Amino acid sequence: SSTSASFAHPYMAAYAASKGGIQAMTHALAAEYSKQGIRFTAVAPGSISSGMTDASGTSKENVGPGLPDDANYEVMMKLLPAIGEGFAGPETVAGVVAMLGSVDGAFITGTEIRIDGGTHM
């Protein structure tokens, strides 16, 4: 899923609707299959340092045209409420998914886990 399912971003209505559908499906499937011990949990990353953020111009390596080096990145960092420096990487999301599949995630189902550094508190 994505944090876009729960928070409005301009020009992303179709994307947000698709992610909202994943959220609703996660809840419904968890209710349907809980008696069989099957768990469903949506993982909703915020801005993650990846090819998608690189293409959007918000990563440190790919700043927007006409701005001084690191300008877009610095603006984005000011919008984050401060867990760490910069965006999480794909390995952070992978760690959460691994936890969900382990005994540590045994009581997590029918919900969404946001990985957004506190952006959407």
Where are these regions (language model features)?
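Short, flexible catalytic-loop segment of classical short-chain dehydrogenase/reductase
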Residues: 45-55, 59, 64
